[in-house]
């Protein structure tokens, strides 16, 4: 018997700095209600879905910085999301900036949660691959200070929910094949992935025309090579003067895009996702147990950066 989940990739248009949490939550609620009306069981929102992408600015005032974070989830302004999800019987994935106090120490993470159809949090993920830079770089029109405002997460976990095995990732994680493989080795059948990606890359502007191609390429490869669904959901449009690529989509285990957003605003892309389709890839071409050779992959965990080989020398054939 097929295991079907009707999934909505809930793209958001730009969120401006002047927008309140209440403004944004109302947009998320509209997505939940529309997705429910269209028969969905799961809605996937973007990374940092409650605020503008604040790492584009260098800020020194702690109070100004803290205003972008959630110190509890659900909190006073987000509880209605959980209540509505429970009332509608629909689950969701949500990305946000997390402010945690652990052993008396204040910590900040770029976080996502998975909420089931009862309104309960069943999984939490903290972004592992933080892009950008840690120090203010005045030459940039927009900063990319994720390394300044967040600590990295430590693991790629999976959770049982929605009738299958679910994984989570955030934005830059999608560019690293290890992201998908670690979850694939835990049997992931659907990976939920929110992102905020600018069109322009100041250190390498020659790549700008390829930004959408690269965005889809890495998610399609990750889906196919691990026999898993991937739901990639963006913040899109011109946000505080910065162009965001959008391109939200749902990708099958075949690597094919089966649903996609076509605008730069609030939009749903919906697909009927059969989790049993994963098996045809996990049991054949990508049967890990039969074909993988982990004994040959030691460098992946032993070495961080590339090291070139020694000068050319003759070898014994």
Feature locations, PLM:
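Active-site catalytic loop in hydrolytic enzyme cores
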Residues: 83, 100-203, 207-217, 283-287
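Short, glycine-anchored, charge-dense loop/turn motifs used at functional sites
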Residues: 7, 114-122, 251-259
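A short C-terminal boundary segment appended to hydrolase-like catalytic domains
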Residues: 279-317
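CN hydrolase (nitrilase-like) catalytic-core segments centered on the catalytic cysteine
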Residues: 73-93, 165, 171-269
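Residue-level recognition of beta-strand->loop/alpha-helix junctions
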Residues: 11-13, 46, 126, 195, ...
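Short, well-ordered beta-strand micro-motif
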Residues: 114, 160, 250, 270-272
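Short beta-strand segments enriched in small/hydrophobic residues
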Residues: 1-15
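Cys-nucleophile CN-hydrolase/nitrilase-fold catalytic domain and related Cys-dependent amidase chemistry
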Residues: 21-126, 132-133, 197-221, 225-228
């Amino acid at each position: 018997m097929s295991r079907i989940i009707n999934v909505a990739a809930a793209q958001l248009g730009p969120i401006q700095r002047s927008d309140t949490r209440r403004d944004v939550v109302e947009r998320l609620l509209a997505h939940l209600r529309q997705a429910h009306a269209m028969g969905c069981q799961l809605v996937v929102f973007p990374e940092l879905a409650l605020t503008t992408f604040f790492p584009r600015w260098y800020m020194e005032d702690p109070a100004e910085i803290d205003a972008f974070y959630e110190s509890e989830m659900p909190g006073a302004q987000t509880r209605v999301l959980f209540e509505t999800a429970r009332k509608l019987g629909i689950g969701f994935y949500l990305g946000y900036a997390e402010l945690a106090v652990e052993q008396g120490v204040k910590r900040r993470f770029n976080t996502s949660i998975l909420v089931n159809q009862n309104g309960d949090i069943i999984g939490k993920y903290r972004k592992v691959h933080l892009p950008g830079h840690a120090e203010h770089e005045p030459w940039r029109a927009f900063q990319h200070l994720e390394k300044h405002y967040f600590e990295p997460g430590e693991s790629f976990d999976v959770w049982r929910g929605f009738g299958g095995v679910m994984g989570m990732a955030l934005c830059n994680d999608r560019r690293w094949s290890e992201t998908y493989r670690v979850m694939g080795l835990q049997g992931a059948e659907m990976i939920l992935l929110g992102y905020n990606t600018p069109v322009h890359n100041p250190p390498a502007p020659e790549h700008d025309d390829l930004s959408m191609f690269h965005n889809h390429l890495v998610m399609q490869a990750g889906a196919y090579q691990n026999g898993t669904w991937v739901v990639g959901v963006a913040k899109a449009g011109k946000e505080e003067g910065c162009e965001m690529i959008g391109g939200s989509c749902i990708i099958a285990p075949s690597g094919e895009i089966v649903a996609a957003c076509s605008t730069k605003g609030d939009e749903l892309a919906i697909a009927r996702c059969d989790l049993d389709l994963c098996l045809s890839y996990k049991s054949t071409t990508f049967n890990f147990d039969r074909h993988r050779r982990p004994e040959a992959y030691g460098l992946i965990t032993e070495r961080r950066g590339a090291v070139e080989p020694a000068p050319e020398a003759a070898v014994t054939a």
